Swiss-Prot record:
Gene3D superfamilies: 3.30.230.10. One of its GO terms (molecular function) is tRNA binding. It comes from Paraburkholderia xenovorans (strain LB400). InterPro entries: Ribosomal_Su5_D2-typ_SF, Ribsml_uS5_D2-typ_fold_subgr, RNase_P, RNase_P_CS. The gene is rnpA. This is Ribonuclease P protein component.
């Protein structure tokens, strides 16, 4: 595995204050089940995950979501530069439509939503880091 494609401990939000500092800001984007927050830090990109029992009661589901999110972030980590990104599950998955904790439809749903959300977040980072466009001078 290449070193830059790894997901080391330094690339994760670990402490409560790190999560709190990102949560204080408004959410950037939402999907049907997830919300993403971001905060510039100037250091390397880090990911925080909040996958609570309230919205994913089964441990297998929570672990599946975490694995998919970590992999998606790991592949896009360079796009986030010096930003902390926090991904939060905010809605339950429909048990009738997705009865198994790790069914292929649930896996596909999570992957598509998380990848779409991280793509939007990467565009947001690019937009916020871009220098402001100068207004044309009129004399």
């Amino acid at each position: 595995m290449r070193a830059q494609a790894a997901f080391p401990k330094a690339a994760r939000l670990l402490k409560t204050d790190e999560f709190s500092s990102v949560f204080r800001l408004r959410p950037w984007r939402r999907t049907a089940h997830f919300v993403v927050y971001g905060r510039p830090t100037g250091n390397e990109a880090r990911l925080g995950l909040v996958i609570g029992k309230k919205y994913a009661p089964r441990a297998a589901t929570r672990n599946l979501v975490r694995r998919i999110a970590r992999e998606a972030f790991r592949l896009r980590r360079a796009e986030f530069g010096g930003w902390d990104v926090l991904l939060r599950l905010h809605t339950r998955f429909d048990k009738k439509a997705l009865p198994s904790a790790s069914s292929p439809p649930l896996r596909a749903l999570c992957r598509s939503e998380i990848e779409a959300l991280l793509d939007k977040a990467a565009r947001e980072v690019t937009r916020r880091e871009a220098p402001p466009a100068e207004a044309p001078k009129t004399e």
